[in-house]
C-alpha cells in the first residue's frame, strides 16, 4: 500500500537571518540536515529504601544540528556562513519543509529583534543556534563539501502547514 501521508526531504530549504543586514538568506544547496533536537535530562528521585531507581524529567538539553553543502567559494552565502561561524554569533534558523515553496521574511518584533515571519502554506521548524564547526571535505571523484554544525539553543518550534 502506497503511503501518501509522508513529507519528502527533497524540496527542503534552510534559511537564516543575517544579524548585520536582517536579510533572510537561503543556505543554498544543502544535501543533508539532521540533529535538530533536545534531549530531556533526568533528575533522580530514588529513596534509599527503594530497590529500583526512579526519575523525573529535568531540563531540556539542546543538541547539535548538522547540515552539509556542496561548498562553493564563489557563493556569497557560503562565504557569509563561514564569516558568521568564525564570529560565533547566534542565528535564527528556519527549515522550510517540502510541503510548500514559499520563503520566510524577517520582521521587527516588539522587543526590537528580527524574527522570521513564516508563510502558512508550508511547514516550518524554527530554532536558534550558533555554528560551532565548518569543515571542508576534499575527496577523489567528488565535489568539495562542507559539514556545518549548529549548537542549538532552546527548544525547536514546529509549525505545521495550514490546512485551511
Curated annotation (Swiss-Prot):
Keywords per UniProt: Virion
Top-level division of the source organism's lineage: Viruses
A Pfam match: Phage_TTP_11
GO cellular component: virion component
Localization of this protein: Virion
Functional summary from the UniProt entry: Structural protein.
Protein's name according to its UniProt entry: Structural protein 3
Amino acid at each position: 500500500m502506497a503511503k501518501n501521508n509522508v513529507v519528502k526531504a527533497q524540496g527542503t530549504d534552510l534559511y537564516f537571518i543575517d544579524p548585520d543586514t536582517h536579510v533572510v538568506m537561503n543556505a543554498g544547496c544543502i544535501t543533508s540536515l539532521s540533529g535538530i533536537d533536545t534531549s530531556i535530562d533526568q533528575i533522580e528521585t530514588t529513596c534509599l529504601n527503594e530497590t529500583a531507581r526512579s526519575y523525573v524529567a529535568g531540563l531540556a538539553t539542546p543538541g547539535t544540528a548538522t547540515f552539509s553543502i556542496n561548498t562553493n567559494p564563489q557563493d556569497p552565502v557560503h562565504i557569509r556562513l563561514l564569516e558568521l561561524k568564525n564570529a560565533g554569533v547566534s542565528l535564527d534558523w528556519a527549515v522550510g519543509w517540502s510541503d510548500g515553496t514559499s520563503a520566510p521574511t524577517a520582521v521587527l518584533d516588539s522587543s526590537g529583534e528580527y524574527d522570521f515571519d513564516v508563510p502558512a502554506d508550508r511547514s516550518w521548524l524554527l530554532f536558534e543556534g550558533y555554528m560551532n564547526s565548518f569543515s571542508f571535505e576534499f575527496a577523489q571523484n567528488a565535489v568539495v563539501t562542507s559539514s556545518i554544525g549548529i549548537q542549538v539553543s532552546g527548544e525547536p518550534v514546529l509549525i505545521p502547514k495550514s490546512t485551511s
